[in-house]
Structure formats: C-alpha cells, structure tokens
C-alpha cells in the first residue's frame, strides 16, 4: 500500500523539517 508509506514518509519529513525551520528562524532573530 504505497499511500500509507508515502503518508508516513510525509510525517517523517515534516517532523524533521519543521524543527529545522524553527531553529533557523530563531538564529535569524538572534542576528
């Protein structure tokens, strides 16, 4: 079932990218 695999892949990517974006925004604000 590729739909479930792509769904979990999307969740994994989102959970990895979101914190990175938040850290990047915090670093930009500190500058």
Swiss-Prot record:
Query: Pfam families per the record?
Result: PetL
Instruction: Specify the protein's topology with respect to the membrane.
Output: Single-pass membrane protein
The yes or no answer to whether the keyword RNA-binding is present is no
Q: Which InterPro entries match?
A: Cyt_b6/f_cplx_su6
Just give the chief location class. plastid
- Which Gene Ontology CC terms are recorded? chloroplast thylakoid membrane; cytochrome b6f complex
The answer on whether this UniProt entry bears the keyword Transmembrane reads yes
Its BP terms in the Gene Ontology are: photosynthesis
Recite the UniProt keywords alphabetically. Chloroplast, Electron transport, Membrane, Photosynthesis, Plastid, Thylakoid, Transmembrane, Transmembrane helix, Transport
Subcellular location(s): the record lists: Plastid, Chloroplast thylakoid membrane
GO MF entries: electron transporter, transferring electrons within cytochrome b6/f complex of photosystem II activity
TM spans, by residue?
Answer: 4-26
Q: Which family does it belong to?
A: Belongs to the PetL family.
* Subunit architecture: The 4 large subunits of the cytochrome b6-f complex are cytochrome b6, subunit IV (17 kDa polypeptide, PetD), cytochrome f and the Rieske protein, while the 4 small subunits are PetG, PetL, PetM and PetN. The complex functions as a dimer.
Q: What does this protein do?
A: Component of the cytochrome b6-f complex, which mediates electron transfer between photosystem II (PSII) and photosystem I (PSI), cyclic electron flow around PSI, and state transitions. PetL is important for photoautotrophic growth as well as for electron transfer efficiency and stability of the cytochrome b6-f complex.
Q: Can you say what this protein is called?
A: Cytochrome b6-f complex subunit 6
